[in-house]
């Protein structure tokens, strides 16, 4: 008899760890509907976007600004919502 994990195709058994969804080999940015874009003229380099990103797709640059790794950004908009300077705009993703 198959356990619940095997029924779903996961083959989960005791003492195993499931692979996480956001890893270097599991690029998760391909299904987003909106893309965050920086407005560098407004950015104060506070780093809140970097701190709140659940996928760690906001990367610091040498000049103090930040950039997105769009391979992993899911477009959740948390960075834009939390930015105190309104320096991040969510734009419709072009497919």
UniProtKB/Swiss-Prot annotation:
Membrane-spanning segments: none
Residue ranges of every copy of the 4Fe-4S ferredoxin-type domain listed in the record: 34-63, 64-93
Residue numbers binding [4Fe-4S] cluster 2: 53, 73, 76, 79
Cofactor-binding details, from the entry: Binds 2 [4Fe-4S] clusters.
Entries under InterPro entries matching the protein: 4Fe4S_Fe-S-bd, 4Fe4S_Fe_S_CS, PorD_KorD, Pyruvate_synthase_PorD
Cofactor: [4Fe-4S] cluster
Keywords: 4Fe-4S, Electron transport, Iron, Iron-sulfur, Metal-binding, Repeat, Transport
Keyword Iron-sulfur on entry: yes
Binding-site positions, [4Fe-4S] cluster 1: 43, 46, 49, 83
Listed GO MF terms: 4 iron, 4 sulfur cluster binding; metal ion binding; oxidoreductase activity, acting on the aldehyde or oxo group of donors, iron-sulfur protein as acceptor
UniProt keyword Iron, yes or no: yes
Subunit structure: Heterotetramer of one alpha, one beta, one delta and one gamma chain.
UniProt xrefs under PANTHER family: PYRUVATE SYNTHASE SUBUNIT PORD
Protein name: Pyruvate synthase subunit PorD
Underlying gene: porD
């Amino acid at each position: 008899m198959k356990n619940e994990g095997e029924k779903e195709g996961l083959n989960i058994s005791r003492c195993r760890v499931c692979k996480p969804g956001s890893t270097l080999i599991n690029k998760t940015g391909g299904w987003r509907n909106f893309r965050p874009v920086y407005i560098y003229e407004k950015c104060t380099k506070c780093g809140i976007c970097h701190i709140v990103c659940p996928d760690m797709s906001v990367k610091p640059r040498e000049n103090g600004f930040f950039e997105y790794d769009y391979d992993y950004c899911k477009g959740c908009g948390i960075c834009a919502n939390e930015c105190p300077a309104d320096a991040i705009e969510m734009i419709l993703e072009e497919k």
